[in-house]
């Protein structure tokens, strides 16, 4: 893929992620359970948590798109593109949950996308194994974050819980695949900086 083709593909992905309603290749896990009756406070909490999870999927699209655009390894590009396609399902599922809960997406989605895209470009520029290291660390942190949401979501909101549980399993698998592909372990200061940035994003997206 030429640099121009990569740029066009990245721009197309950004527009689709930010402004189009995503379509899932696989049915949402929420479809298998009944919608619960939540009181207003429970609905607000579930909506806020699913908005945060939707932001995470916006960032995943940006990260994978940037890394796939710069790698010269065709096999790695194919793996990144496949992971991005799977994350589109997550993007669609979280958007569906937001709609069902009467909640909106984050107003700062373009900012989150741009930041994650820049991070992906930097990681890819350093090298493929570092790029895979960012994937492994990001997915591991996201999986831990999703586990915390399973503890916070209303117990009766089985639809949101089903989506989050499936996403957690997928993120853990993506992290394991990145490590198996030769991901470098990132230095502790980098991991700490990523966690700090994630905390800022999640605390902001909870409300905005």
Swiss-Prot record:
One Pfam family recorded for the sequence: COQ7
GO cellular component: plasma membrane
Protein's cellular compartments: Cell membrane
Reactions catalysed according to its record: a 5-methoxy-2-methyl-3-(all-trans-polyprenyl)benzene-1,4-diol + AH2 + O2 = a 3-demethylubiquinol + A + H2O
Cofactor note: Binds 2 iron ions per subunit.
Binding site for Fe cation 1: 57, 87, 90, 171
InterPro entries registered for this protein in UniProt: COQ7_proteobact (IPR047809), Ferritin-like (IPR012347), Ferritin-like_SF (IPR009078), Ubq_synth_Coq7 (IPR011566)
Biochemical pathway: Cofactor biosynthesis; ubiquinone biosynthesis
Cofactor: Fe cation
Domain of life: Bacteria
Residues noted as binding Fe cation 2 in the record, renumbered to the chain: 87, 139, 171, 174
One BP term from GO: ubiquinone biosynthetic process
Functional description taken from the UniProt entry: Catalyzes the hydroxylation of 2-nonaprenyl-3-methyl-6-methoxy-1,4-benzoquinol during ubiquinone biosynthesis.
Entry's family note: Belongs to the COQ7 family.
Official protein name in the record: 3-demethoxyubiquinol 3-hydroxylase
Species this chain originates from: Verminephrobacter eiseniae (strain EF01-2)
Taxonomic classification: Bacteria, Pseudomonadati, Pseudomonadota, Betaproteobacteria, Burkholderiales
